[in-house]
């Protein structure tokens, strides 16, 4: 979804986007629907792990999205950039361009978030990120208890300082899931140089 949007933005390239699954599903549109998608073959590949001794020979579900937007259309919508130290470690191991400082501009460009500091958060990106609306005395009591145990309160865990406790940020806006299909494909679908073909399970491309 993201790549198709970016490649067709200039009008210089033509893109055919093939999706094995359907264009969308009713339950992908509303946040509460994610629990219905965990084992729904119409929108989920329903992969499972192989039995192992460590799991008492159980098969563990590995949900993967089978519709436009992929797994962003069925996941729990919690938005986490990743631990800054992990990116820095990758750079130290020789992966140039992967430090947190290097990837921060990309994170900022992709998101639209009203909170946090301007130097670390994006305001005009396609992906809508919001603070969770599910607040109340219980959540605050848990956070206060963590603080009493020495865990710092982290108002914006996507700022680069993730150690601590705080409320989650979500890819939800105005009561709707913000999947990559909604944020990247919907704005691009009317461009003359993109063709989106759903229900197209593909084994090989003959060029």
Write out the residue ranges for each language-model feature.
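N-terminal redox-cofactor-binding region of secreted/periplasmic oxidoreductases
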Residues: 1-207
């Amino acid at each position: 979804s993201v790549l198709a949007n970016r490649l067709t933005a200039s009008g210089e390239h033509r893109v055919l986007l093939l999706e094995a699954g359907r264009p969308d599903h009713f339950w992908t549109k509303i946040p509460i629907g994610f629990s219905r998608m965990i084992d729904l073959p119409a929108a989920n590949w329903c992969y499972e792990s192989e039995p192992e001794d460590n799991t008492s020979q159980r098969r563990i579900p590995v949900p993967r999205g089978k519709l436009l937007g992929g797994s962003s259309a069925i996941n729990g919508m919690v938005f986490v950039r990743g631990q800054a130290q992990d990116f820095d470690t990758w750079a130290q191991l020789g992966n140039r361009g992967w430090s947190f400082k290097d990837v921060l501009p990309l994170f900022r460009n992709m998101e639209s978030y009203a909170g946090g500091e301007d130097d670390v958060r994006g305001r005009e990106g396609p992906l809508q990120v919001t603070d969770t609306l599910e607040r109340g005395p219980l959540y605050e009591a848990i956070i206060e208890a963590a603080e009493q145990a020495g865990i710092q309160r982290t108002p914006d865990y996507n700022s680069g300082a993730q150690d601590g406790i705080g409320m989650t940020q979500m890819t939800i806006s105005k009561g709707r899931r913000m999947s990559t299909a909604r944020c990247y494909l919907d704005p691009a679908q009317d461009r003359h140089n993109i063709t989106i073909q759903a229900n197209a399970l593909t084994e090989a491309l003959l060029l």
